Amino acid sequence: MIRFLTALMLTVMLITLPGCRQQQQLQQNAATPEYVYVEGYTAYMRGNKAVAPSKAPKRIKKLIAAGNKIVHCPYRRGGGHGRHVDSGYDCSGSVGFVLREAGMMGRVQYRTSRQFLSWGKPGYGKWLTVYVKRGHVFLVVAGLRFDTSGTRTGIGPRWYTKSRKCAGFYVRHVPGF
């Protein structure tokens, strides 16, 4: 019986361990998808705010509305971690804010971008993809990029239609989105 249980445990370990390696890092020439507008399925810009596509799920519409609430906020290192509603946001604070507002994160507080490596599931989503690596995290939501910049100018959360390089990032998503 002990041999059987040992063999069973080893088999389970061998089957589940490869799943830990399914998450792959994007290659050097990788970039976010180019923005292409598709009626009903792609968000678009009106000024500095995003307009959700008509066919987007309710949570995606909530996420876009949440992003619009903070696009005017400046970049602030550590912003959005101590308080959900803050005067400035860094990358993980802004991503955490919109995901919580959309009901996609629960009460979990992600204090660093690196912690998003375990959020959701590996791979690209249909409506939402999280790009994450140590030191930075951003989203692509219904075709628009929601991103911050920690440069000296301190650009806080913003929506972008332009692609960006993403070598070294991992991609994550919520199943169904």
Ranges and model annotations:
Residues 16-74, 152-177:
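Intrinsically disordered, low-complexity
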Residues 1-4:
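Positively charged n-region of N-terminal signal peptides that target proteins for export
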Residues 83-102:
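Active-site nucleophilic cysteine motif
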Residues 68-88:
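Active-site nucleophile-His-acid catalytic modules used for acyl/amide transfer and hydrolysis
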Residues 53-57, 61-64, 96, 100-177:
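...with weaker cross-activation on analogous glycine-rich loops/strands in unrelated enzymes
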Residues 46-49, 78-83, 112-117:
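Short linear capping/connector segments at secondary-structure termini
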